[in-house]
């Protein structure tokens, strides 16, 4: 996995990720990882934002808040990594993932 400061983001992505970090903190998430085409930087203009969410007891509330409170026309695809996740998906997140948020413990 990489950290978000390893990549040059657009101003729009920065605004989205800042809002996401605030929500992650508010909902008690331990870690948020971007994966998929945006993490690989192979995305198109309208590609969705794939997020792996770790350690969020209020995942459904968090997922709803992300959709409702983050101002973008892009769609989000959130995966609760504490639930049942295929080995292929877990490997993709580990291989391509970019850590956007990690709680301070």
Regions found by a protein language model. Give the residues of each.
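Catalytic core of pol beta-like nucleotidyltransferases
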Residues: 1-31, 39-45, 54-105
